[in-house]
Amino acid sequence: MTDTVSRPLRPRPALTEDNSFFFEGAKQGKLLVQRCSSCGVLRHPPRPACAQCRSFEWDTVEAAGTGTIYSYVVVHHPQVPAFDYPLPIAVVELAEGTRLVADVIGVAADAVRIGMPVAVEFVAVDDELTLPMFRPT
């Protein structure tokens, strides 16, 4: 009999009616961003009301999936079993102007730089969860 050790699952996002579109879009290979229906401002993370005009009306737009690294950190500790370390995590400024936090993949952690151009890649981290991550271009 062979024992196989399976990797622990990543922590699950807390799904709400305001953010579930984002994770459903990721499963379909789409980077969806919330847009205020009243003033057109894009926002991320998703939330119920627009910070600019206070409207509760919104829709979504598909982002191009390209941008640059606005800021980043490299996580070394504490190590959580579901992740590989060192773990570069960036604030990515999308071409559309809004920013989001995501893993940086396909590059050594010490090679990540502010201003580095990146493109989205959708990674199925397990059978239930697909996340947008960014790879240098």
How should these model regions be labeled?
Residues 85-100:
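Short, basic/aromatic beta-hairpin or loop at an interaction surface
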